[in-house]
Amino acid sequence: LLSHTAGFTDGLGFGDYAADETLPDLEDELDNPRASSGMPVEIRINLEPGTEWHYSGGSYLLLELLVEEISGQAFEDYVQETVFEPLEMSRTGYRFIDTYANSAGSLGTDGARMTGHQYASSAATALATSSADLAKFVLAQTGTGAASSPLSPESVKAMRVPHGQSAGFDIWGLGTILYAPTGNGDFLFGHDGANEPAINTAARLNPENEDALILLVSGHPSLATDIGSDWVFWQSGYPDLFATDAVFASMVAPGLAGTLVILTLAVLFGKRSRRLT
């Protein structure tokens, strides 16, 4: 579930809810999730677990439900007690973003201030935090901050063991994106996030030198990820999966145009050859 290899193929990115809407409970969201695509989505196993990587927001709904059933607490309360309080993350939680004092607010791509949105999955989308608090969370995953971490060093290292692959590359650990290999056989890791209105975030860490990058962006849909990709290349000499996807996407239109030109020339030369014969 953590590595998107459980056999779910929903590809679910969570849609937002207006400030005055009532959020569904966890079971209702599992049965009828609101997808960012606006299309109906079913959360079901379609592949043998462990055989393929497919992004699945539904997996994180199930993880949220597992935490609640095993702990006997609401997911938000459990994370508050076991993660936020030990790390003294006092500006972090799952409340509606517009209810936080001194919130930076939400901006559209034109820079206009917008009403914040609610999100139905706490585990996947609803976290609100500050850059200072997120720095504490990232530090706890380094050797320097191990004493304050709610996880053992062994658990943190296990998060970076590859479980998900795409196009032959290791891209996902246990809840972490594996951006690029380091020189000692480890991975630059972390996670990016994106949602409406024009929210983009990145928290990336190099365990080899304990350098990190934290970006919380509102008003641009990809700025944090774009800068994060440059940072990964600077740190490792390798492009990350987001940069690679962008290169492939940029090649599609020229590739199609080139194919069309080749086919057109082939037809013309074919006709010319027939006339000559």
Where in this protein do the model-derived segments appear?
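Generic low-polarity alpha-helical segments
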Residues: 72, 208, 213-214, 264-266
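Extracytoplasmic/lumenal ectodomains and periplasmic regions of secretory and membrane proteins
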Residues: 125, 163-164, 176, 180-231
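Short, gly/Ser/Thr-rich active-site loops of penicillin-recognizing serine hydrolases
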Residues: 168-172, 181-188, 216-277
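Small/flexible residues
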Residues: 97, 206, 274-276
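Low-complexity, compositionally biased segments
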Residues: 28-31, 136, 209, 229, ...
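Short, low-complexity, polar/charged sequence segments that are solvent-exposed and flexible
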Residues: 20-23, 208-210, 232-237
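Short, surface-exposed loop or secondary-structure junction motifs
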Residues: 1-189, 196
